């Protein structure tokens, strides 16, 4: 399947398919015509010999320095080279592919004033490769200047840029937007897996399902809560927990009782952030922009993507209690006084070995690190002395996206432990009748990690379970 770029309707799932699935991309004829029209406006403005930021002047603190027509080619070359200050590891291929896609879609919008030939060059790098090498660190989010300079340097390959095209290539947030989109897609899969693990926890703990009573949705009309209640009810359809007397407690610990509420809040946050991502994937991030019907270029601040950066902060904050609760539930399953099962989920009481007890330390370490990553970053301050006090604020959008991705990786590892612990507890409860969804989840886990019997080592390699999460196996 080919994704056709119009500049207006690129969806999150399309970016994921292109970035990870290798789908090809092309630009719509209407978008090509729009780029030709706005480029003609740029050429006419050039003929008027006006002072226009980034077109006939330098950038940043050098906005007062005139760039003449015969200097444009060299100016573009140096602009890109001088911004290649990125540090750290190389971005993954999927992030680079997503960045190329977002850049091309921004050009297709027509506000950049670049020639269609440049947009086609971006598409060719995406479809045919080789992919540019892009460093991950160095952007404050007021345009991903270092990353976009790396990207442009990697695919231009002798292509001669026209006036404004150098600035259009680097003065945008395509790297942050693509990184955010991929992380948010992963977050959706993680939340699905957390629902499944949470449902299996309820059965492993022999918890009280009064928390799923329909009155909860009626009295607290949050979309995320309602969706979570419906999903947990479906996962637990047919479970022994619906039988009279199945629950061990009148009220369970809060991390069991509040599971729908906590997960629901995260789902509300996710829905909001997904909307922000899709807006940003199709919004102009340029400065200046071409206003065709006025035959002019207008200086703006479209590179300030605080709506996305703050939303990513919001999602991490909402995800932290979900992970903390998962950690607490699995630890309680390991504790005999709370679970009613042998300590550490050993085969029987009185054994000297720890069985799965030490998983509690691993889960606490993962959770502590994840919570630290939830700290908001979009309110960080830039130095007002650089350059000449002009660039005096930031969004830190790339950091916000990177921290979400790191938090999700930790979450995947935590949920892998949670699923294994819950499966062990279910086995020790003599394998009661599980729900339709939890039966499937239990089987998937047990196909990869067997029951831990007397003398068995702790199942340290949980990557097969993590791969289930990443594959979307728990999203069905």
For each feature predicted by the language model, list its residue ranges:
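C-terminal auxiliary extensions adjacent to catalytic cores
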Residues: 1-23, 27-34, 38-46, 68, ...
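FAD-binding core of FAD-dependent oxidoreductases
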Residues: 53-78, 82-105, 133-155, 159-177, ...
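Generic internal hydrophobic packing segments that stabilize the cores of diverse globular domains
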Residues: 39, 72, 76, 96, ...
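A glycine-/small-polar-enriched, mobile loop at the entrance of the PLP active site in fold-type I
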Residues: 25, 85-86, 109
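FAD-binding glycine-rich core of flavoenzymes that anchor FAD
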Residues: 110-137
């Amino acid at each position: 399947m080919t994704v056709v770029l119009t500049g207006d309707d690129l969806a999150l799932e399309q970016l994921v398919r292109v970035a990870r699935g290798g789908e090809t991309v092309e630009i719509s004829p209407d978008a090509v015509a729009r780029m030709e029209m706005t480029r003609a406006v740029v050429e006419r403005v050039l003929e008027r010999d006006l002072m226009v930021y980034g077109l006939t002047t330098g950038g940043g603190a050098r906005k007062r320095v005139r760039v003449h027509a015969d200097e444009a080619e060299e100016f573009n070359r140096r602009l890109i080279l001088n911004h290649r200050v990125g540090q750290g590891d190389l971005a993954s291929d999927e992030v680079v592919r997503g960045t190329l896609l977002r850049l091309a879609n921004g050009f297709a919008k027509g506000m950049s004033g670049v020639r269609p030939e440049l947009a086609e060059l971006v598409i060719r790098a995406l479809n045919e490769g080789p992919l540019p090498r892009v460093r991950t660190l160095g952007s404050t989010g007021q345009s991903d200047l270092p990353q976009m300079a790396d990207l442009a340097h990697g695919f231009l390959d002798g292509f001669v840029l026209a006036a404004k095209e150098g600035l259009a290539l680097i003065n945008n947030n395509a790297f942050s937007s693509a990184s955010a989109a991929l992380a948010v897609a992963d977050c959706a899969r993680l939340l699905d897996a957390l629902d499944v693990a949470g449902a299996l926890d309820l059965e492993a703990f022999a918890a009280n399902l009064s928390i799923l009573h329909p009155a909860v949705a009626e009295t607290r009309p949050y979309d995320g809560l309602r969706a979570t209640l419906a999903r947990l009810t479906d996962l637990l359809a047919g479970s022994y927990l619906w039988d009279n007397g199945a629950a061990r407690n009148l009220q369970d610990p809060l991390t069991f009782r509040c599971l729908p509420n906590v997960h629901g809040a995260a789902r509300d946050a996710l829905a909001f952030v997904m909307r922000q991502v899709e807006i940003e994937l199709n919004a102009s991030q340029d400065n200046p922009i071409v206003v065709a019907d006025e035959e002019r270029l207008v200086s703006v601040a479209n590179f300030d993507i605080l709506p996305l950066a703050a939303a990513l902060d919001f999602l991490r904050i909402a995800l932290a209690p979900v992970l903390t609760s998962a950690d607490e539930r699995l630890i309680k399953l390991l504790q005999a006084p709370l679970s009613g099962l042998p300590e550490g989920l050993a085969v029987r009481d009185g054994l000297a070995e720890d069985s799965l007890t030490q998983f509690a330390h691993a889960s606490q370490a993962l959770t502590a690190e994840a919570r630290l990553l939830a700290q908001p970053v979009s309110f960080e301050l830039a130095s007002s002395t650089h350059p000449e006090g002009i660039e005096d604020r930031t969004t830190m959008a790339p950091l916000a996206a990177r921290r979400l991705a790191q938090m999700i990786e930790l979450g995947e590892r935590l949920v892998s432990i949670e699923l294994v612990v819950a499966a062990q507890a279910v086995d020790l409860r003599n394998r009661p009748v599980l729900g339709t969804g939890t039966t499937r989840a239990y089987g998937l886990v047990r196909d990869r990690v067997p029951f831990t019997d007397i003398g068995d080592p702790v199942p340290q390699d949980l990557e097969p379970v993590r791969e289930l999460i990443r594959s979307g196996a728990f999203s069905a």
